[in-house]
Amino acid sequence: MLKRILITNDDGFDSPGLLALKEALCDVAHLTVVAPANEKSACGHGLTLTSPLRFIKLDDDVYKLRDGTPTDCIYLALNALYEEHSKPDLIISGINLGSNMGEDITYSGTASGAMEGVIHGIPSVAFSQLLHDKNTFGFDFALAKKVVRELTLKILSGGFPLGDRKFLNVNIPYVGIEEFKGYKVTEMGYRLYGNDAHLHRNPRGEEHYWLGLHPLAWNERNNARESDFKVATEGYVSITPIKLDLTSYEDIKELEAWI
């Protein structure tokens, strides 16, 4: 019996990254796709509570969710499309158009799709493809499809390597298969941000802002393990284990003394 995989993303149902993901796994498992009807990049772990959501069926087991976030997609798919006794064996979010590394994970709708999956007790992986920009014309996703397929088969055959409420965050380098150097397990790097609020004026002189993306810059955390940024920009696939518990345990005793 085929395993069941639930797929979402944050770039929208018509993203070439989502198409590449489906192509990589179409013969590996039974796929159900529930993706946002519109791009939801950087929406974070947002759940829609103030407006109704509607599935729009595009094909057998393929849906777009009108006004939905990746978190909505996973939440509703698990609670409205799947029977209690037939939940998916794996949830995959991606393939994101661009990296999700360091503190960018907290903004990422792609990472949040996987985050929602593990909240519901289902092994989950977020895949992101490093790009120079979002213009994917002519980009074949060959390495990304290879990586997705290899890691998915490994999980389905050998089990998920992490415990409860932990997911895998995978970043794929912007290189061809022949330049691919292999896999490395990494920690989150220290993302550097700047002022990317861009002021514009319309023809009537009214001001508005666009928020841009800061160039990919980071610091290492001075630990023994390399960061996701360093590894992925050197031609390796970065695999980072992410846990939902954000407690700063090393600060508890000092905080107790402070109060």
Curated annotation (Swiss-Prot):
Catalytic activity field: a ribonucleoside 5'-phosphate + H2O = a ribonucleoside + phosphate
Pfam families (alphabetical): SurE
Residues that hold a divalent metal cation according to the record: 10-11, 41, 96
Matches recorded under SUPFAM superfamilies: SurE-like (SSF64167)
Classification via InterPro entries: SurE, SurE-like_Pase/nucleotidase, SurE-like_sf
Entry annotated with the keyword Iron: no
Its EC number(s): 3.1.3.5
Required cofactor(s): a divalent metal cation
Cofactor notes: Binds 1 divalent metal cation per subunit.
Keyword Zinc-finger: no
Gene Ontology molecular functions: 3'-nucleotidase activity; 5'-nucleotidase activity; exopolyphosphatase activity; metal ion binding; nucleotide binding
Coarse class of the protein's main subcellular location: cytoplasm
Keywords, ordered alphabetically: Cytoplasm, Hydrolase, Metal-binding, Nucleotide-binding
Function: Nucleotidase that shows phosphatase activity on nucleoside 5'-monophosphates.
Family recorded in the similarity comment: Belongs to the SurE nucleotidase family.
Name assigned to this protein: 5'-nucleotidase SurE
Organism: Wolinella succinogenes (strain ATCC 29543 / DSM 1740 / CCUG 13145 / JCM 31913 / LMG 7466 / NCTC 11488 / FDC 602W)
Encoding gene (name): surE
